[in-house]
């Protein structure tokens, strides 16, 4: 099971899930990452093991 947390290093709207994933894994120690719609825009969300 994964817990999601907004990226702490991504700024602005997320338009590239691949780049978001790489940044979550490389910079934040997450297992995965993707662009998800969170009001008011697409955000980079990182996924961690709960």
UniProtKB/Swiss-Prot annotation:
Modified how: Contains 4 disulfide bonds.
Q: Pfam families from the entry?
A: Gamma-thionin
Give the top-rank taxon of the lineage listed in the UniProt record for this protein: Eukaryota
What's the main place this protein lives? secreted
Question: Which GO biological process categories is it annotated with?
Answer: defense response to fungus; defense response to Gram-negative bacterium; defense response to Gram-positive bacterium; killing of cells of another organism
Question: Which SUPFAM superfamilies does the entry mention?
Answer: Scorpion toxin-like (SSF57095)
Compartment list: Secreted
Q: List the disulfide bonds.
A: 3-50, 14-35, 20-44, 24-46
Q: Output the Gene Ontology cellular-component terms.
A: extracellular region
Q: Which InterPro entries match?
A: Defensin_plant, Scorpion_toxin-like, Scorpion_toxin-like_sf
Q: What UniProt keywords apply to this chain's record, in alphabetical order?
A: Antibiotic, Antimicrobial, Disulfide bond, Fungicide, Plant defense, Secreted
Write out the function statement from the record.
Answer: Antimicrobial peptide active against fungi, Gram-positive and Gram-negative bacteria. Inhibits growth of hyphae in the fungi A.niger (IC(50)=3.5 ug/ml), B.sorokiniana (IC(50)=1.8 ug/ml), F.oxysporum (IC(50)=5.3 ug/ml), F.graminearum (IC(50)=6.9 ug/ml), F.culmorum (IC(50)=6.9 ug/ml) and B.cinerea (IC(50)=13.7 ug/ml). Has no effect on spore germination. Destroys spores in germinated conidia by disruption of cell walls and membranes in A.niger and B.sorokiniana. Causes vacuolization of germinated macro- and microconidia in F.oxysporum, F.graminearum and F.culmorum.
**Which family does the similarity line name?**
Belongs to the DEFL family.
Q: What name does this protein carry?
A: Defensin D2
Q: Name the source organism.
A: Nigella sativa
At the highest ranks, the source species' classification is: Eukaryota, Viridiplantae, Streptophyta, Embryophyta, Tracheophyta
């Amino acid at each position: 099971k994964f817990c999601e947390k907004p990226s702490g290093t991504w700024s602005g709207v997320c338009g590239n899930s691949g780049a978001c994933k790489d940044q979550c894994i490389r910079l934040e120690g997450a297992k995965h990452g993707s662009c998800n719609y969170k009001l008011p825009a697409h955000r980079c969300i990182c996924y961690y093991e709960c």
